[in-house]
């Protein structure tokens, strides 16, 4: 399932471009710069005119972590309290109107309620036992459903390829759907079981042995809470972007020999040809939209329906390539920016300065990738609050009403010929 994005609506107004530019500029100012550069600033950002290709891969309930957002939780609690108050009020009115109730009826009902409570507690204990059995299946649930390639060299593929059980349909309960069953067809298993130290990434999260011996990851299955709304929805989408977005930066290149800051040379850097191919989640709940990137898509995965070939690593020039054919290197679960090109504007200088320019380019690309990963890669996300638009509309309507009332008050007591009331004229 796919859909078209009206990308022009994002580029007509320059507000979005300006906001993203200010955000990136602030993020770059917060990082520690190496000794050979200074005064790093983002001077321009443009989304471009080419939209990404977005394909819906899964539809279900939003992740529980999105409900932990303070604004969302506060709004939901307020709505729940209002509904409870209304329910109690209606329930109380019904009791007062019913003359058939007496003390004996109430006592009998209390006894029945106690019996019902005991039955409910027994049922809840049974449900909790069943629920506990599924806790460790948060990420790995559905691993046996995967159809791995027998000849695959991926460690995780070998560990599950021997399963003789026939594939089963995915769970009907959306909250029980696993990351693994959703993301497997897009090359995620290529990073499962990888070695090397690192942070909490799917390299560890999607490893079954890791789950059985370590603390459960943050992503966990929880029972549906009262603050969930039936209209809440989450899309797991595949984003493939090869557009004309560009970022312009200005930085001073420093030569610290024979003394610190001996030469300061301004350099303009143009970042273009950005390639993004990732799986992301888009959740809509309580008039708020959440966006978070989950993992990169491996275009070389044999089950992935793509003819794209992995380009070889380039040498020289200003093209920075993140692809690596060395499986022994510990790969982060997500880069978001898979490929990028940097063009430098600099005058004629000595060769040692040009070598430093390459260092600057590599540093900036790494920092850009880190910023995106820290801000919009799971377990981080961005939240777009749609309630702000409603508040602005209400304020505008209120101002219009106040203006109309003010005009009426100004005209009150005046006649068409400009005379005041008779009492005032008499005085």
From Swiss-Prot:
Keywords, comma-separated and alphabetical: Endoplasmic reticulum, Lipid transport, Lipid-binding, Membrane, Mitochondrion, Mitochondrion outer membrane, Transport
Record-linked InterPro entries: Mdm12, SMP_LBD
GO cellular component terms listed in the entry, alphabetical order: endoplasmic reticulum membrane; ERMES complex
Biased composition (Acidic residues): 106-133, 387-402
Regions crossing the membrane: none
Main location: mitochondrion
Domain SMP-LTD: 1-387
UniProt record, GO biological process: mitochondrial genome maintenance; mitochondrion-endoplasmic reticulum membrane tethering; phospholipid transport; protein insertion into mitochondrial outer membrane
Region: Disordered, residue numbers: 81-168, 387-427
Composition bias type Polar residues, residue spans: 146-161
Origin: domain of life: Eukaryota
Lipid bilayer topology: Peripheral membrane protein
Biased composition (Basic and acidic residues): 81-96, 411-427
GO terms, molecular function: lipid binding
Localization: Mitochondrion outer membrane; Endoplasmic reticulum membrane
Summary of subunit composition and partner proteins: Component of the ER-mitochondria encounter structure (ERMES) or MDM complex, composed of MMM1, MDM10, MDM12 and MDM34. A MMM1 homodimer associates with one molecule of MDM12 on each side in a pairwise head-to-tail manner, and the SMP-LTD domains of MMM1 and MDM12 generate a continuous hydrophobic tunnel for phospholipid trafficking.
Family: Belongs to the MDM12 family.
HAMAP family, alphabetized: Mdm12
Function: Component of the ERMES/MDM complex, which serves as a molecular tether to connect the endoplasmic reticulum (ER) and mitochondria. Components of this complex are involved in the control of mitochondrial shape and protein biogenesis, and function in nonvesicular lipid trafficking between the ER and mitochondria. MDM12 is required for the interaction of the ER-resident membrane protein MMM1 and the outer mitochondrial membrane-resident beta-barrel protein MDM10.
Domain free text: The SMP-LTD domain is a barrel-like domain that can bind various types of glycerophospholipids in its interior and mediate their transfer between two adjacent bilayers.
Protein name (Swiss-Prot/TrEMBL): Mitochondrial distribution and morphology protein 12
Native source species: Candida albicans (strain WO-1) (Yeast)
């Amino acid at each position: 399932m796919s859909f078209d994005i009206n990308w022009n609506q994002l580029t007509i107004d320059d507000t979005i471009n300006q906001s993203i530019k200010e955000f990136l500029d602030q993020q770059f100012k917060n990082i520690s710069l190496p000794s050979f550069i200074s005064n790093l600033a983002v001077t321009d950002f443009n989304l471009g005119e080419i939209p990404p290709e977005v394909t819906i891969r899964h539809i279900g309930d939003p992740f529980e972590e999105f409900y932990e957002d303070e604004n969302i939780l506060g709004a939901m609690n307020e709505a729940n309290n209002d509904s409870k108050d209304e329910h109690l009020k209606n329930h109380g009115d019904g009791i007062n109107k019913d003359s058939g109730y007496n003390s004996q009826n109430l006592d009998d009902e209390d006894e029945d309620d106690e019996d019902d409570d005991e039955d409910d507690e027994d049922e809840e204990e049974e449900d909790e036992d069943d629920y506990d059995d599924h806790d460790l299946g948060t990420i790995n649930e559905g691993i046996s459903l995967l159809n791995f390639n027998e000849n695959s060299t991926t460690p995780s593929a070998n560990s599950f390829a021997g399963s003789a059980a026939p594939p089963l349909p995915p769970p009907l309960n959306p909250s029980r759907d696993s990351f693994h069953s959703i993301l497997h067809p897009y090359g995620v298993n290529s990073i499962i079981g990888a070695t090397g130290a690192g942070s909490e990434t799917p390299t560890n999260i999607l490893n079954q042995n890791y789950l059985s011996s370590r603390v459960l990851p943050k992503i966990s299955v929880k029972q549906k809470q009262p603050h969930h709304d039936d209209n809440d929805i989450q899309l797991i989408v595949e984003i493939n972007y090869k557009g004309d977005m560009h970022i312009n930066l200005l930085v001073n290149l420093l030569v610290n020999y024979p003394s610190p800051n001996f030469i300061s040379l301004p350099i303009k850097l143009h970042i273009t040809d950005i390639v993004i191919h990732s799986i992301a989640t888009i959740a809509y709940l309580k008039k708020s939209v959440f966006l978070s990137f989950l993992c990169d898509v491996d275009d070389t995965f044999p089950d992935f329906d793509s003819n794209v070939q992995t380009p070889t690593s380039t040498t020289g020039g200003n093209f920075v390539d993140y692809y690596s054919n060395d499986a022994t290197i510990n790969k982060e679960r997500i880069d978001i920016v898979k490929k990028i090109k940097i063009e430098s504007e600099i005058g004629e200088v000595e060769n040692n300065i040009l070598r430093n320019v390459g260092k600057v380019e590599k540093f900036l690309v790494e920092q850009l990738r880190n910023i995106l990963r820290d801000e919009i890669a799971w377990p981080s996300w961005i939240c777009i609050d749609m309630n702000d638009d409603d508040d602005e509309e209400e304020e505008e309507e209120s101002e219009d009403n106040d203006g109309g009332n003010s005009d009426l008050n100004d005209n009150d007591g005046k006649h068409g010929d400009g005379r005041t009331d008779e009492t005032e004229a008499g005085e």
